Amino acid sequence: MADSVLFISWGESIPGREERGLEVFNEAIGLYGRMQQDGRIESFNVVLLAPNGDLGGYFEIQGSAEQLAAVRQDEEFRRVLTDAQLIVKQMRIIDGSTGEGIARDVALYQEAIAKVPQTA
């Protein structure tokens, strides 16, 4: 069961690079689909957002922490991200938790706040 996520988001396309942007978007979907079929990730979601002047959309890749660490080192994954960074603004790649990873991270947080004096 997935306990970790990679959240990959992007903003607006750089003007004049929209066609290449669509190509790279489709390459990413194909790559993540192959990774899922090969068992290298558990699943992925694609979300396109309504125009808002900031966030255009995101991929959410789910898997174990070990799977996602391997994904980050995958040459094809890195190539797709490099291509994407040249055609969109505000690209972000953020690690996160899901499933059992939430309980693990909440436990760490509870442990940390126990060490901090609480004030009203």
Predicted regions and their residues:
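Mid-chain, well-packed structural core segment of small domains
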Residues: 60-89
